[in-house]
Amino acid sequence: MLILTRRVGETLMIGDEVTVTVLGVKGNQVRIGVNAPKEISVHREEIYMRIQAEKGDNEASGNKV
């Protein structure tokens, strides 16, 4: 895992097309902005895990998503 320190307004690059910008810090919360092409899905981890679980449930029951 790469660990970086960024200040509000600073950005990091992931590849050539994805940027992550620190928008704000308040207490123990950090607001970030992600710019990525439409074909790259961006989800919070808990949403991604729910999507994967639903895919697995649908595949197990023979349904296509």
Curated annotation (Swiss-Prot):
GO MF annotations, alphabetized: mRNA 5'-UTR binding
Main location class: cytoplasm
Species: Colwellia psychrerythraea (strain 34H / ATCC BAA-681)
GO biological process terms held by the UniProt record: mRNA catabolic process; negative regulation of translational initiation; positive regulation of translational initiation; regulation of carbohydrate metabolic process
Family the entry assigns: Belongs to the CsrA/RsmA family.
Function: A key translational regulator that binds mRNA to regulate translation initiation and/or mRNA stability. Mediates global changes in gene expression, shifting from rapid growth to stress survival by linking envelope stress, the stringent response and the catabolite repression systems. Usually binds in the 5'-UTR; binding at or near the Shine-Dalgarno sequence prevents ribosome-binding, repressing translation, binding elsewhere in the 5'-UTR can activate translation and/or stabilize the mRNA. Its function is antagonized by small RNA(s).
Protein name in the entry: Translational regulator CsrA
Gene Ontology CC annotations of this record: cytosol
Alphabetic keyword roster: Activator, Cytoplasm, Repressor, RNA-binding, Translation regulation
Pfam families per record: CsrA
Top-level taxon of origin: Bacteria
